[in-house]
């Protein structure tokens, strides 16, 4: 899967290809442009280990939900477009109090129409938790009662029918890919018998035993090592998500050993951030110094022992504290999550520093940088001094939202962009700026050059770009640069009396010229068409980034 396919749904790629075809019909005087098959970093470049990174996304804090499950007046800030790269599973966690369903509906509409297709285009699976006791056990009992039967009379067909009902209600209705059994109880044998059968019935449709193991997912999510509800159906699940909030890697080691006979290394421990309004729990997972934090310990343990991955709960609360933040909703730069992704995936410190400097270099092309509280030079200095991944990322992002060079820098995404060579384009931008600034006189050629340069800068300072887009911007700039060198016009009288031959040759062999400039109008048209096409591709990709 190419990088562009992760960024944009198929319909965007088709639209771009259609625009390219239309432009080619109008003129052939331009270079190949961005398309869905761009040569660019693959998913393997971004996340090559096969380990998972899951985030719990609290739906009631999405920008589309207002006043749901909250008594705080603050506006929500996060959307699913903010989910960092390197995440491959999003667990949608939602509680909608009775009477607030109408206020919550915009999120579920957006999820199905926009969020899910976008995240799918990035290779991300979407799952939703269902309560073990409420759905996997008592839900089935209620289902049987509605048919005037007891649980002891249940047949495989009954379990299959109930499983389809659960999948339709919790998964298909909102465009998701799987379910997560949230087990935080100690069920008795009768309950386990029911849940075993419900889980087996669900596994016919989702997860590793289904007919679609690559496009669906079935998870078991728990906070302990009570194995009775799990051991008989372990093969039905993709992995175990283990809530070890407030605990170091010592607990990871013990719990992973408990589950290893049943699930192997497909064990995914998780940590949490402080939730607003929680006046009781104090987990302190994300605390400096970084290398003493639970985040560093668990991410390192996952990497070193090749476990199934890692997860974080309450993505939007990344970086929050147990003081004033318990009573407010404020934006986050997602520093801890982005670092945990890189740490658990084994990103080398040198790679992290190269990615950070790459980002600073390309963002410095902007004449005005809107969101920086620190200069690029200061950030570069801090990157150079950084001793670990956290310090490297913090050098660019800052310790909290609004404190760094950028609020949105994504180290995993940037590491993927390192595979696209932008050096030639950067040289062309420098050369163009030199020519544009050489004198104040404006001309058609300079206007075209400015347009091409600004489009290239706009593209390179976006969130993401492809190799084909870089090629398009580069070739448009080359055409514009060439157009600033006038084509010599032969004298009106030829010394050898060959005026007619020269004129005829000029008419037949030279492109049309702009009056009094000697600049090819074909080149100017080519620059405009190339930039128009590259610009469309850019605007579409930005819309979804």
From Swiss-Prot:
Keyword Cell membrane: yes
EC numbers for this chain: 3.2.1.96
Subcellular location: Cell membrane
Ranges that cross the membrane: 518-538
Annotated consequence of substituting residue 184 to N: Loss of enzymatic activity. Binds to the core of N-glycans, Man(3)GlcNAc(2). Also shows significant binding to the alpha1-6-fucosylated pentasaccharide, characteristic of human N-linked glycoproteins
Biotechnology: EndoBI-1 might prove useful as a novel tool for diverse applications in proteomics and glycoproteomics research.
Topology with respect to the bilayer: Single-pass membrane protein
Temperature dependence: Optimum temperature is 30-45 degrees Celsius. Is heat-resistant, since the enzymatic activity is not significantly impaired by incubation at 95 degrees Celsius for 1 or 5 minutes.
Source organism, top-level taxon: Bacteria
Positions annotated as active site in the UniProt record: 184 (proton donor)
All residue ranges annotated as the GH18 domain in the record: 51-333
Gene Ontology MF terms in the entry: mannosyl-glycoprotein endo-beta-N-acetylglucosaminidase activity
InterPro entries hit by this protein: EndoS_F2-like_TIM-barrel (IPR057016), Glyco_hydro18_cat (IPR001223), Glyco_hydro_18_chit_AS (IPR001579), Glycoside_hydrolase_SF (IPR017853)
Assigned keywords, A-Z: Carbohydrate metabolism, Cell membrane, Glycosidase, Hydrolase, Membrane, Signal, Transmembrane, Transmembrane helix
pH dependence: Optimum pH is 5.0.
Catalytic function, reaction form: an N(4)-(oligosaccharide-(1->3)-[oligosaccharide-(1->6)]-beta-D-Man-(1->4)-beta-D-GlcNAc-(1->4)-alpha-D-GlcNAc)-L-asparaginyl-[protein] + H2O = an oligosaccharide-(1->3)-[oligosaccharide-(1->6)]-beta-D-Man-(1->4)-D-GlcNAc + N(4)-(N-acetyl-beta-D-glucosaminyl)-L-asparaginyl-[protein]
Signal peptide (residue range): 1-36
Family affiliation: Belongs to the glycosyl hydrolase 18 family.
Cited function: Endoglycosidase with broad specificity that cleaves the chitobiose core of high mannose and complex N-linked glycans. Is able to release N-glycans from diverse host glycoproteins such as human and bovine lactoferrin, immunoglobulins A and G, and ribonuclease B. Is active directly on human breast milk - a complex matrix of lipids, oligosaccharides, and proteins with disparate glycosylation types - successfully removing a significant proportion of the total amount of N-glycans. Does not recognize O-linked glycans or free human milk oligosaccharides (HMO).
Name listed for the protein in its UniProt record: Endo-beta-N-acetylglucosaminidase
Organism: Bifidobacterium longum subsp. infantis (strain ATCC 15697 / DSM 20088 / JCM 1222 / NCTC 11817 / S12)
Lineage, opening ranks: Bacteria, Bacillati, Actinomycetota, Actinomycetes, Bifidobacteriales
């Amino acid at each position: 899967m190419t990088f562009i396919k992760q960024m944009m749904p198929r319909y965007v790629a088709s639209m771009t290809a259609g625009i390219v075809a239309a432009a080619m019909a109008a003129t052939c005087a331009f270079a190949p442009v961005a398309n869905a098959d761009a040569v660019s970093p693959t998913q393997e470049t971004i996340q090559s280990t096969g380990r998972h990174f899951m985030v719990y996304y609290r739906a009631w804090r999405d920008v589309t939900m207002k006043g749901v499950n909250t008594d705080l007046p603050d506006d929500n800030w996060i959307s699913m477009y903010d989910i960092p790269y390197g995440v491959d599973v999003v667990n949608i966690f939602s509680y909608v109090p009775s009477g607030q369903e109408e206020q919550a509906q915009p999120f579920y509409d957006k999820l199905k129409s926009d969020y899910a297709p976008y995240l799918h285009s990035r290779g991300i699976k979407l799952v939703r938790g269902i309560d073990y006791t409420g759905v996997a056990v008592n839900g089935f009992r209620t289902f049987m009662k509605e048919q005037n039967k007891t649980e002891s009379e249940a047949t495989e067909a009954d379990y299959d029918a109930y499983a389809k009902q659960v999948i339709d209600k919790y998964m298909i209705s909102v465009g998701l890919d799987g379910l997560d059994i949230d087990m935080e109880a100690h069920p008795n044998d009768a309950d386990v018998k029911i849940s075993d059968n419900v889980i087996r019935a669900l596994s016919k449709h989702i997860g590793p035993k289904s007919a679609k193991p690559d496009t669906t997912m079935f998870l078991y999510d728990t906070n302990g090592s009570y194995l009775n509800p799990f051991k008989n159906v372990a093969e039905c699940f993709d992995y175990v998500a283990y809530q070890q909030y407030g605990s170091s890697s010592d607990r990871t080691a013990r719990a992973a050993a408990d589950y290893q006979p049943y699930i192997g290394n497909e064990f995914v421990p998780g940590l949490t951030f402080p939730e607003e309004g929680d006046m009781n729990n104090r987990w302190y997972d994300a605390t400096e110094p970084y290398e003493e934090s639970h985040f560093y310990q668990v991410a390192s343990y996952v990497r070193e022992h090749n476990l199934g991955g890692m997860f974080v709960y309450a993505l939007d609360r990344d970086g929050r504290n147990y003081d004033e933040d318990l009573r407010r909703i404020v934006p986050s730069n997602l520093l801890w999550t982005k670092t945990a992704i890189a740490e658990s995936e084994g990103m080398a410190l040198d790679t992290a520093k190269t990615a950070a400097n790459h980002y600073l270099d390309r963002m410095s092309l902007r004449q005005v940088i809107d969101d920086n509280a620190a200069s690029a030079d200061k950030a570069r200095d801090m990157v150079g001094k950084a001793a670990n991944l956290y310090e490297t990322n913090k050098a660019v992002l800052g310790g909290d939202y609004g404190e760094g060079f950028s609020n949105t820098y994504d180290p995993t995404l940037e590491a993927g962009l390192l595979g696209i060579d932008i050096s030639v384009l950067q040289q062309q931008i420098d050369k163009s700026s030199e020519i544009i600034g050489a004198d104040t006189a404006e001309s058609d050629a300079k206007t075209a050059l400015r347009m091409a340069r600004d489009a290239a800068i706009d593209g390179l300072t976006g969130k993401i770009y492809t190799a084909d887009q870089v090629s398009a911007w580069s070739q448009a700039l080359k055409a514009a640069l060439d157009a600033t060198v006038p084509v010599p016009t032969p004298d009106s009288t030829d010394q050898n009396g060959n005026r007619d031959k020269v004129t005829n040759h000029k008419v037949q062999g030279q492109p049309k010229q702009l009056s009094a400039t000697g600049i090819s109008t074909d080149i100017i048209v080519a620059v405009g068409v190339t930039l128009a096409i590259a610009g469309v591709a850019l605007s579409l990709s930005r819309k979804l980034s």
